[in-house]
């Protein structure tokens, strides 16, 4: 039976992960793929199997990966698998997120960028790590692969659209589309408010014209000559009343507000 052998390495404590806002990474859209990604490689090592899982944290420390050191953005865990028994963790390699990074652009293909951690202490060894963020404009999913692990250096590749350079023109275009959407929303809002006012005006006009019509009928004025006179007079009266109503609304609302605020103020003053 294998005894649990735990090699646990952590570097200086820190809370900062791979800084996607750094000037080297600003031109990429890595913030859109923020999160933790893992890749496992199982090989037969009779009488057991060995599972090596590497995880990376993009724009934030690695989360929800058991046994990974706190505040690490690159982490490798080696487990021994034996049928009928619980996995035994034999190695834990953690690259703290505060380790000084080195950056190198990728010239081949559609480009990308390499993030490097160099000479990280792990027991008696120094370990290097490289994450190749490779631009793939046709990628439908984000693809993490383990390209190399020889006990001294680990090389991981991450293919994604997020690793493609976004030009200033495209950024302005996206901002322009957002502004157009905001303008359209404002126009829709303004149109809705305008139609609301027209609806109320129409209701008032119909109401007053109905009153006028009833008044004409009550007076018994049904001749053609008398109708225009009463119509013009009533219409003028309706318009004047409607204008007076609109003018009185602000003072009416102000009076209501003053009643509430005034009574509240007096109550506070009396209490003092």
Curated annotation (Swiss-Prot):
The keyword Nuclease does not apply. GO terms for cellular component: cytoplasmic vesicle membrane; Golgi membrane; mitochondrial membrane; phagophore assembly site membrane. It is found in: Cytoplasmic vesicle membrane; Golgi apparatus membrane; Mitochondrion membrane; Preautophagosomal structure membrane. Residues 215-272 are cytoplasmic. Residues 1-17 form the signal peptide. The chain crosses the membrane at residues 194-214. It is a single-pass type I membrane protein; Single-pass membrane protein. InterPro entries: Autophagy-rel_prot_27, Man6P_isomerase_rcpt-bd_dom_sf, MRH_dom. Disulfide bonds join 20-59, 68-75, 135-164. Its main location: membrane. Keywords: Autophagy, Cytoplasmic vesicle, Disulfide bond, Golgi apparatus, Membrane, Mitochondrion, Protein transport, Signal, Transmembrane, Transmembrane helix, Transport. Belongs to the ATG27 family. This is Autophagy-related protein 27. It comes from Lodderomyces elongisporus (strain ATCC 11503 / CBS 2605 / JCM 1781 / NBRC 1676 / NRRL YB-4239) (Yeast). The gene is ATG27.
């Amino acid at each position: 039976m294998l005894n649990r052998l735990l090699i646990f390495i952590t570097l200086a404590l820190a809370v900062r992960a791979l800084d996607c806002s750094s000037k080297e990474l600003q031109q990429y859209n890595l913030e859109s793929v923020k999160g933790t990604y893992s890749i496992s490689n199982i090989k037969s090592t009779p009488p057991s199997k060995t599972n090596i899982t590497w995880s990376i944290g993009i724009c934030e420390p690695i989360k929800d990966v058991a046994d990974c050191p706190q505040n690490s953005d690159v982490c490798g865990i080696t487990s021994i698998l034996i049928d009928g028994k619980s996995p035994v963790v034999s190695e834990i390699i953690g690259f703290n997120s505060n380790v000084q990074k080195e950056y190198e652009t990728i010239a081949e293909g559609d480009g990308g960028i390499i993030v490097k951690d160099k000479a990280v202490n792990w027991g008696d060894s120094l370990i290097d790590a490289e994450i190749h963020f490779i631009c793939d404009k046709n990628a439908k999913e984000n693809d993490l692969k383990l390209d190399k692990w020889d006990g001294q250096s680990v090389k991981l590749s991450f293919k994604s659209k997020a690793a493609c350079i976004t030009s200033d023109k495209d950024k302005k275009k996206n901002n322009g589309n957002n502004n157009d959407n905001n303008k359209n929303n404002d126009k829709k809002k303004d149109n809705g408010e305008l139609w609301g006012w027209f609806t109320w005006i129409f209701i008032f006009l119909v109401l007053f014209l109905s009153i006028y019509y009833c008044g004409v009928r009550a007076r018994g004025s049904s001749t053609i000559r008398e109708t225009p006179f009463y119509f013009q007079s009533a219409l003028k009266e309706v318009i004047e009343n409607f204008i007076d109503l609109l003018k009185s609304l602000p003072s009416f609302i102000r009076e209501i507000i003053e009643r509430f605020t005034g009574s509240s103020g007096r109550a506070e003053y009396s209490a003092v």
